[in-house]
């Protein structure tokens, strides 16, 4: 049986991502559910879309292709992002993070768009 914090975090995780939290989590996942999703993810003030846009901005500035694809895909799947967001976000990123990093964001968004066409 998982802690109440884990259960609250897992419930929030499942609102944010199109998959279920593990019933038998390793230590890293347990900590993520209990802290990131339970403590921070359930705070009032920012919507799931707001949080996703912040994450996208941060990981775009880092050039983190894997998390960009994860967040773009989850945003589409969970209804937080539209297909036009996949075009506009990399364009906007180009002005704040620079063109080379916006190319990484655009490539990740394009990969997710390709999946929508199939």
Question: What spans do the regions from the language model cover?
Answer:
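Acidic, glycine/proline-rich low-complexity segments that act as flexible tails and inter-domain linkers
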Residues: 1-49, 69-72, 77, 101-118
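Amphipathic alpha-helical core segments of compact helical bundles
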Residues: 37, 59, 91-98
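Short, structured motif recognition centered on aromatic/hydrophobic residues
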Residues: 51-59, 89
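Short helix-coil transition sites and intra-membrane helix breaks within transmembrane domains
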Residues: 62-66, 98-101
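Mid-chain, well-packed structural core segment of small domains
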Residues: 64-87
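C-terminal structural segments of small proteins and small subunits
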Residues: 87, 94-107
């Amino acid at each position: 049986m998982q802690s109440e914090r884990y259960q609250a975090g897992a419930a929030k995780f499942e609102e944010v991502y199109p998959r279920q939290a593990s019933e038998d989590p390793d230590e890293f996942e347990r900590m993520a559910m209990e802290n990131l999703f339970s403590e921070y993810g359930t705070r009032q003030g920012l919507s799931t879309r707001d949080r996703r846009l912040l994450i996208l901005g941060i990981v775009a500035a880092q050039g983190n292709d894997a998390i960009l694809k994860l967040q773009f895909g989850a945003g589409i799947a969970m209804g937080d992002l539209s297909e036009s967001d996949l075009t506009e976000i990399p364009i906007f990123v180009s002005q704040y993070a620079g063109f080379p990093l916006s190319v990484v964001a655009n490539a990740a968004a394009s990969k997710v768009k390709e999946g929508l066409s199939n």
